[in-house]
Structure formats: C-alpha cells, structure tokens
Amino acid sequence: MAHLTARRPQNVEGDLYVDSSCIDCDTCRWMAPNIFGRDDEQSAVFHQPETEAERLAALQAVLACPTASIGTVAPPKDMKEAQASFPIPITDNIYHCGYHSEKSYGAASYLIQRPDGNVLVDSPRFAAPLVKQLEALGGVRYLYLTHQDDVADHQQFHERFGCDRILHADDIGSGTTSVEIQLKGSDPVELAPDLTIVPVPGHTKGHTVLLYDNRILFTGDHLAWSVRLHQLHAFRSVCWYSWPEQIKSMEKLAAYDFEWVLPGHGRRHHADKATMRQHMQKCLDWMKAQ
C-alpha cells in the first residue's frame, strides 16, 4: 500500500497521491490521464478527482498500479465499486483486466470473451476480486502469453481455471517449462478460426502477437502507440533480442488487417484498417531510421 510519509511533493494537494515507490510504468497515466501526470521520472497527481467518472478512473488506477504506489489520505468508501468495474470493457467483447503485476513491470492484460472459450492475454496479478469477475464472465480457456517478460502469475491462473497456457518455445524459461502449448517456428498458428498467433521475434526471440477476429491485435511489447511521437512505434531501447529481426517482424505484421493495437506496455491505438496500414508503414519507416 502507498505510504503518506512517502508522498511525492509533485502531487497537488488533496486526498489522492502517488508515493515514491512508483516505478514509472505509465499505467495510471493512461488509465486516468486527467488525474495523473509525469514529473521527474515518476507519476504524480496533477488534478484531484472532481466528478464521479474521475473518481472511478482514479480508483481503477489505484487497483491497477503494480506497486500499490497510489493512495488516499482518507480510506475510500467506494473501492468495491471500482473492484466491480473490472475487467473494463474496451470494445465489444474485449476487456482490460487491470490489476497489473510488478513481475511484468506493470504490463497490461486483456480478456477476450468468446463462445468457444475465453482467452486471457498475458497475466495480470492473481487478485481475488479480478478472479471472481473472470469467473462470472465464463472463466479462462486459454492463457496466451506474448513473451517471457509478461507471464507474471500464470501458474496461479492455470491452477484456478485449468486453462491451457500458450508461449513460444524460444521464450520458455525456468518458470514456464510446464506451459501446455509451446509454439515452434516462425509460421503463423491458427489457434481457432478467429484466433491467429503471429511470431514476431525482436523484443525477445520468442515474442508473438495475437490477432483476434481480424480486428484486434494484442501486441505485448512488440508495438504500441507513442504519445510523444504521435505514431505507432517499437521500443528500441528495450529490444532484448534483435532490432533488425524486429523490423523484419514488423514488415510481416504490416501485411495483416486490424483496427486495434492493444499492447502490454505503451498506449493502445484504434483506427480503421486503411489508416492503420498507413500507420504501420510510418512505424516501419521510423524503425529503419533508428
């Protein structure tokens, strides 16, 4: 939990605050951009919530924060309402799970609700309120893991829901040797007619992305929207395997049609398919110039 004695001086006065344990993962800033900002490489409260919507967004950020670095001076009486709001709908049957894990440096996790079995994309924290909500939405059939960095509490979700975990063999480590479906090679894998897994080595050797319904692309740490650059981009400074390979992977990915980019880290992006193709080309041009 956040500690008032460690409250950052960059916070504005008021009930809500960020303490000095913040790891600058950006979660609160994109979940509640009217409330949180960045100052001196950490988050801070720039504006105290004034409306019910702002209050809910702020408490959702409190729950999602992977390091429990956000607190309130007065114990919140409306936290159960915030807990019940997760997972948060994004579009149609796609949800943001919240409850980010410090084990994955605060990466976002998502849920695809589908008649043939729900898919949990990357692992959130194994938090009781979230688990209860996932049960109410139909449980978890597959736990798809984009890459080795964002596996977090995968074992607990597997034990609770009996879900099959999916991870590329090149990203299997000591904590994931028991993963049920270990992908191999560089060819796309059709898990189901509406689920296509595309290997995209670069950030890690075994990184993959998941395309759902030819509309929603779950990108892990391969691709995200940059607010600073105002375009899609890749993370050159944290490319652990190969930047040239990541460029090749992005070229392959540019051949697919999709409308949403939902990343583990970075900001999400939505555009029509034609515009998204243009944004992908701009991303490639930028990558090749680095």
Segments and roles (model prediction):
Residues M1-V12:
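A detector for short, charged/polar N-terminal pre-domain segments
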Residues L16-A32, E52-A68:
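Cysteine-centered iron-sulfur cluster-binding motifs in ferredoxin-type domains/subunits
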Residues R38-E50, D78-P87:
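Short cysteine/histidine-rich metal-coordination sites, predominantly Zn2+-binding motifs
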Residues D40-E41, P76-D92, N118-L120, F126-A128, K132-E135, V140-D150, A152-K205, V238-Y241, ...:
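Metallo-beta-lactamase
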